[in-house]
Amino acid sequence: MTPLDAKRPLQLNAQGQLQHFLSLDGLPRELLTEILDTADSFLEVGGRAVKKVPLLRGKTICNVFFENSTRTRTTFELAAQRLSADVITLNVSTSSASKGETLLDTLRNLEAMAADMFVVRHGDSGAAHFIAEHVCPQVAIINGGDGRHAHPTQGMLDMLTIRRHKGSFENLSVAIVGDILHSRVARSNMLALKTLGCPDIRVIAPKTLLPIGIEQYGVKVYTDMAEGLKDVDVVIMLRLQRERMSGGLLPSEGEFYRLFGLTTARLAGAKPDAIVMHPGPINRGVEIESAVADGNQSVILNQVTYGIAVRMAVLSMAMSGQTAQRQFEQENAQ
């Protein structure tokens, strides 16, 4: 585990409100619950004839993605548009960054265009924290995923999915399965589940895909699928991240599927009403059988729907927190 997983007070303003969203580590249960409650209230916007509310009218949100993304980028764009914000999405492959401009130079140029918020995805762990510490303080920073470190909005949309299907975290058993070592989603989910009071958090993976020190998250570690899935309420499958792997961690994808793929037979060991989740993109026949991904227990497409509402909640709350912080600073400067 990384020293980046320490409490980061710069996420909160002087009143304890969200002003950046960088990691779930150190955020109180009350704040995570507020995000879930706010997201719940935004779900009905997607069913309207006009799918908009005016909360961020006049604000400019820049999506700056240094890594490829489909679901995260698109749902952030939709979330901002449904809040009536103006949205700029930077294609890094055609931007000055691909010509040698530094990360901070790119963002400071966007900042000079009076952007109010950056949603940043970057391959380096800690990039979002670095940006929040170095750009103009009145610009809110939302972490869209940084290296292996964190993917906090994915963590929260997974929590909303679980809460809407299971009602409460208090008596749940949740299994997170697959490439734990390289997964920022796994880290965010473990933190969120622990904070929200889930008593039984399990990780299931080959020993080569388990990070050193994972026990600090308060999880039970399994290297056998049948044992780890026994009587669980929720199964969260993870993508096998070949692009982040060095050689020798796995014999083959086929061998991984044979031992750790979620099949109908293996899912039968979980509770009969267990739900199956996956952050996407899915590798069918590697992490999960198509019959399971498309089956009645799968809530994978629900996750995408809930992701828009969660990102609406985070964008609106962080913008509100930034405004409150500026007012606080102005009042105390007088």
Curated annotation (Swiss-Prot):
Disulfide bonds: none annotated. It is an enzyme of class 2 (transferase). One of its GO terms (molecular function) is aspartate carbamoyltransferase activity. This is Aspartate carbamoyltransferase catalytic subunit. Transmembrane segments: none annotated. Heterododecamer (2C3:3R2) of six catalytic PyrB chains organized as two trimers (C3), and six regulatory PyrI chains organized as three dimers (R2). Its EC number is 2.1.3.2. L-aspartate binds at residues 99, 184, 239. Pathway: Pyrimidine metabolism; UMP biosynthesis via de novo pathway; (S)-dihydroorotate from bicarbonate: step 2/3. It comes from the Bacteria. Belongs to the aspartate/ornithine carbamoyltransferase superfamily. ATCase family. One of its GO terms (biological process) is 'de novo' pyrimidine nucleobase biosynthetic process.
